[in-house]
């Protein structure tokens, strides 16, 4: 019984490992000249255009800053 539990745990870890590796989140900043503190929606569009070819579904999070946007997006 104990061997089966260890095997199942090993199998679950093995199956989830490729997804964790392939979904690396990258953080980059881009300048935003139109507004001193841009809205999140403006940052999301700017990040999608700059890093993912317009694909907003790959943008995980954005954080507006002083004339900049911090972009968190998935590589794959």
Curated annotation (Swiss-Prot):
UniProt keywords, alphabetically: Disulfide bond, Ion channel impairing toxin, Potassium channel impairing toxin, Secreted, Signal, Toxin, Voltage-gated potassium channel impairing toxin
Entry annotated with the keyword Signal: yes
Location(s), subcellular: Secreted
Tissue spec. comment: Expressed by the venom gland.
Taxonomic source organism: Scolopendra dehaani (Thai centipede)
GO molecular function: potassium channel regulator activity; toxin activity
Keyword Secreted: yes
Family: Belongs to the scoloptoxin-15 family.
Function: Acts as a voltage-gated potassium channel inhibitor.
Protein name: Kappa-scoloptoxin(15)-Ssd3a
Post-translational modification comment from the UniProt entry: Contains 2 disulfide bonds.
GO CC, one annotated term: extracellular region
Signal peptide: 1-23
Coiled-coil ranges (or none): none
């Amino acid at each position: 019984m104990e061997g089966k539990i260890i095997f199942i745990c090993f199998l679950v870890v093995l199956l989830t490992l490729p997804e964790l590796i392939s979904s690396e989140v990258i953080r980059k900043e881009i300048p935003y000249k139109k507004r001193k503190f841009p809205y999140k929606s403006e940052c999301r569009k700017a990040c999608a255009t700059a890093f993912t070819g317009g694909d907003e579904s790959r943008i995980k999070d954005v954080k507006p800053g002083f004339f900049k946007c911090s972009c968190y997006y998935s590589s794959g």
